[in-house]
């Protein structure tokens, strides 16, 4: 009887231990905090030269065998596939599976991959390790798994929703972006992925971040759908002081568009992953900043307290704006960040980097706090990341928003009706919105405009646009010193009522 009683108690204790055990961000945070108190150890590459020195076309030949997708034999809507190391993805990351009772390392095997025509010694790849992973989910069709998340390289990750193709990227953390000292790129060194149940509609991923001057613990809850949403929680620790910390960084590409046309003839009218930075400031103001591809590094800062949101958007999705059948820029998502809680005082910062082609990401946006704690102290950030093609949801419903910004040579119509250039630069800015459409065409809409010390507004007028049922602002600007940037702002008003978001533009230097 005593033996049976002891056995029952042991079973109950086991059940209790199993039910109470749960992996959490705190488990990762303990590692991150411990690392922050030690010296940084750079990751060591174990990659044979044939993989490290390969070109992109060769790396593309290494394909994951889809019939060996992780969780393929489980009744779960989520599947995992892995990236092989190669090129600059030359250090392995650890990937673990979290179940209800344990954590298990997902071991690398070359059998996961088809190496195509890549000649290699099989013995040299048997213990290499993964470079990253991707998440598959039946987002577009119930009977087909589509890739919805890619985590590969440093702390980069890309996410898409239904009917979208990969475009801009998000990152875990940015350090000293655009500073003369050079940028530091933290990397996710280890991941823990919760095994989803058959009925789960979300996937939870934990990550350990490491770099010479910072460590961090991250939790990503991925919720796929028409808009795929990623709920992010991070605990960040500094090893040493940094010049600038970039929180919730986004990375994108802008080559050319109507505000900055292509310098060479191109059948594509626009070429970009994103065409503007949108900000919902802490004071309620909405700001739209069209992107540039400048000839020199450019940084724009928007100081505020407790931002309500910001993101890099792809406004205007008509195929005729892009005309690219291969890369489908019209299907690339916008990314919107919604902070949770108060983030305090700081700046939303935009960095624009010169590029000659679309293969380089040259746009970065992030939040940078004014005050940073001493090394070792914990910083907490929570936010949601929404990847969407529904930009109508990403601005105030009662505010008009900027549909397009077009640049032209400024001119004056002569008495003979011929337009004569007058040395100015002209901007055409179209505002549209649901509430604006309801206004009678004869509403006395006006513009509040301003320009920095390096420019002068020569002419400004607003007229009704019967095509868009909105209003068009036309500006002619005189630049004093073409070697300097020129800042300008504008918003539409009706008497004392603000009708639109603020158009905030920086004319790059030497244009």
Swiss-Prot record:
Q: What Gene Ontology molecular function terms does this protein carry? A: carbohydrate binding; catalytic activity
Stored Gene3D superfamilies: 2.70.98.10, Immunoglobulins
Q: Which Pfam families match?
A: MdoG
Q: Can you cite an annotated GO cellular component?
A: outer membrane-bounded periplasmic space
Q: Could you say which residues form the signal peptide? A: 1-22
Q: Which HAMAP family match?
A: MdoG_OpgG
Q: What is this protein called?
A: Glucans biosynthesis protein G
In its UniProt entry, the species of origin is given as Salmonella typhimurium (strain LT2 / SGSC1412 / ATCC 700720)
């Amino acid at each position: 009887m005593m033996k049976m009683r002891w056995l029952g108690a042991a079973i109950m204790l086991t059940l209790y231990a199993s039910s109470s055990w749960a992996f959490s961000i705190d488990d990762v945070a303990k590692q991150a905090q411990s690392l922050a108190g030690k010296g940084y150890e750079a990751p060591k590459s174990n990659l044979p030269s044939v993989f490290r020195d390969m070109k992109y076309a060769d790396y593309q030949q290494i394909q994951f065998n889809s019939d060996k997708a992780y969780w393929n034999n489980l009744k779960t809507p989520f599947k995992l596939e892995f990236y092989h190391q190669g090129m600059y993805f030359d250090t392995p990351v650890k990937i673990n599976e979290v179940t209800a009772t344990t954590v298990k390392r997902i071991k690398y095997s070359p059998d996961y991959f088809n190496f195509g025509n890549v000649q290699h010694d099989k013995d040299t790849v048997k213990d290499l390790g993964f470079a990253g992973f991707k998440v598959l989910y039946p987002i577009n069709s119930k009977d087909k798994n589509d890739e919805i998340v890619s985590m590969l390289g440093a702390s980069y990750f890309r996410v898409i929703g239904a009917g979208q193709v990969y475009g801009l990227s998000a990152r875990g953390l940015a350090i000293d972006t655009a500073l003369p000292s050079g940028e530091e790129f933290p990397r996710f060194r280890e991941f823990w992925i919760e095994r989803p149940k058959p009925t789960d509609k979300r996937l939870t991923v934990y990550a350990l971040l490491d770099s010479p001057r910072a460590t961090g613990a991250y939790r990503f809850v991925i919720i796929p759908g028409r808009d795929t949403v990623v709920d992010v929680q991070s605990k960040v620790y500094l090893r040493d002081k940094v010049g600038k910390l970039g929180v919730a960084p986004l990375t994108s590409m802008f080559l050319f568009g109507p505000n900055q046309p292509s310098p060479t003839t191109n059948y594509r009218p626009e070429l970009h992953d994103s065409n503007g930075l949108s900000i919902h400031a802490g004071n309620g103001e909405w700001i739209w900043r069209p992107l540039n591809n400048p000839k020199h590094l450019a940084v724009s800062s928007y100081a505020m307290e407790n931002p309500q949101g910001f993101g890099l958007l792809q406004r205007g999705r008509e195929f005729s704006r892009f005309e690219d059948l291969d890369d489908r820029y019209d299907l690339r998502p916008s990314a919107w960040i919604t902070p949770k809680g108060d983030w305090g005082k700081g700046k939303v910062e935009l960095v624009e980097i010169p590029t000659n082609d679309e293969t380089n990401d040259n746009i970065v946006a992030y939040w940078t706090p004014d005050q940073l704690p001493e090394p070792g102290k914990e910083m907490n950030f929570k936010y949601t990341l929404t990847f969407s093609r529904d930009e109508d949801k990403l601005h105030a419903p009662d505010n008009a928003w900027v549909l397009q910004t077009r640049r032209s040579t400024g001119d004056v119509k002569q008495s003979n009706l011929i337009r004569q250039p007058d040395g100015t630069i002209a901007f055409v800015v179209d505002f549209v919105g649901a509430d604006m459409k309801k206004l009678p065409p004869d509403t006395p809409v006006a513009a509040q405009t301003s320009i920095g010390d390096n420019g002068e507004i020569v002419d400004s007028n607003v007229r009704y646009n019967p095509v868009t049922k909105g209003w068009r602002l036309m500006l002619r600007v005189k630049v004093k010193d073409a070697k300097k940037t020129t800042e300008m702002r504008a918003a539409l008003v009706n008497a004392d009522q603000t009708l639109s978001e603020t158009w905030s533009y920086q004319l790059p230097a030497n244009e």
